[in-house]
């Protein structure tokens, strides 16, 4: 048999060191881990920003819709009869009808000031959004009407219908008939011809009379 030294390969390893060689895999894995964390953080931040943008758009759309409804209601109130409406013949009672459907009963105030009826409505609502923002809504409305002389301000009453119409009514006072009063006729002592002449003619006549004298 041949000795073992003869069957061994004649070449030896290039690096006969006993320590394992370093590779790039652990460092690459660490870099990818940090990159993944950064991407997740950026995605979460973008989602939060998108939620805020969506909430702002929702509030803006809601505010725009409420403004549109308010404008439509104001135009409808102006087109409707907001002036006093009398009864059948206008002699029995005084009536004023107002459209107040945008306000609840506890937001309305009706009062008389002298011979004027004043109706005011105030609406206020505060709310917090999901992202911590603050929403404040405020509306104020006012109408005034002059009471006729035949209406006693202390007898004014009002009622609110289901369709949002405020009815203000008051009975008309029964005025006593005017008494029969004779009117005297005054007599004018000036000559009728002098009244019919113009002022220049009267002056010239007066000067002629002085020359004759």
Swiss-Prot record:
<dbReference type="GO" id="GO:0051082">
    <property type="term" value="F:unfolded protein binding"/>
</dbReference>
<dbReference type="InterPro" id="IPR002068">
    <property type="entry name" value="A-crystallin/Hsp20_dom"/>
</dbReference>
<feature type="region of interest" description="Disordered">
    <location>
        <begin position="61"/>
        <end position="93"/>
    </location>
</feature>
<feature type="domain" description="sHSP">
    <location>
        <begin position="76"/>
        <end position="188"/>
    </location>
</feature>
<dbReference type="InterPro" id="IPR008978">
    <property type="entry name" value="HSP20-like_chaperone"/>
</dbReference>
<protein>
    <recommendedName>
        <fullName>Heat shock protein 30C</fullName>
    </recommendedName>
</protein>
<dbReference type="Pfam" id="PF00011">
    <property type="entry name" value="HSP20"/>
</dbReference>
<dbReference type="GO" id="GO:0009408">
    <property type="term" value="P:response to heat"/>
</dbReference>
<dbReference type="GO" id="GO:0005634">
    <property type="term" value="C:nucleus"/>
</dbReference>
<feature type="region of interest" description="Disordered">
    <location>
        <begin position="174"/>
        <end position="213"/>
    </location>
</feature>
<dbReference type="GO" id="GO:0042026">
    <property type="term" value="P:protein refolding"/>
</dbReference>
<comment type="similarity">
    <text>Belongs to the small heat shock protein (HSP20) family.</text>
</comment>
<dbReference type="GO" id="GO:0005737">
    <property type="term" value="C:cytoplasm"/>
</dbReference>
<keyword id="KW-0346">Stress response</keyword>
<dbReference type="InterPro" id="IPR001436">
    <property type="entry name" value="Alpha-crystallin/sHSP_animal"/>
</dbReference>
<feature type="compositionally biased region" description="Basic and acidic residues">
    <location>
        <begin position="61"/>
        <end position="80"/>
    </location>
</feature>
């Amino acid at each position: 048999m041949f000795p073992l030294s003869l069957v061994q390969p004649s070449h030896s390893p290039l690096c006969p060191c006993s320590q394992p060689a370093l590779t790039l895999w652990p460092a690459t894995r660490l870099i990818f881990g940090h990159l993944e964390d950064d991407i997740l953080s950026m995605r979460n931040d973008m989602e939060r920003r998108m939620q805020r943008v969506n909430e702002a758009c929702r509030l803006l759309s809601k505010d725009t819709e409420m403004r549109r409804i308010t404008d439509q209601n104001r135009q409808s109130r102006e087109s409707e009869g907001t002036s006093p409406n009398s009864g059948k013949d206008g002699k029995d009672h005084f009536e004023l009808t107002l459209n107040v459907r945008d306000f609840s009963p506890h937001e309305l105030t009706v009062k008389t000031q002298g011979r004027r009826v004043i109706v005011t409505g105030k609406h206020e609502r505060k709310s917090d959004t999901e992202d911590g923002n603050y929403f404040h809504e405020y509306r104020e409305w006012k109408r005034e009407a002059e009471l006729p002389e035949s209406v006693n301000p202390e007898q004014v009453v009002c009622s609110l219908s289901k369709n949002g119409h405020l009815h203000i009514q008051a009975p008309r006072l029964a005025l006593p008939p005017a008494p029969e009063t004779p009117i005297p006729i005054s007599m004018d002592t000036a000559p009728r011809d002098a009244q019919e002449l113009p002022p220049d003619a009267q002056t010239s006549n007066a000067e002629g009379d002085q020359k004759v004298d």
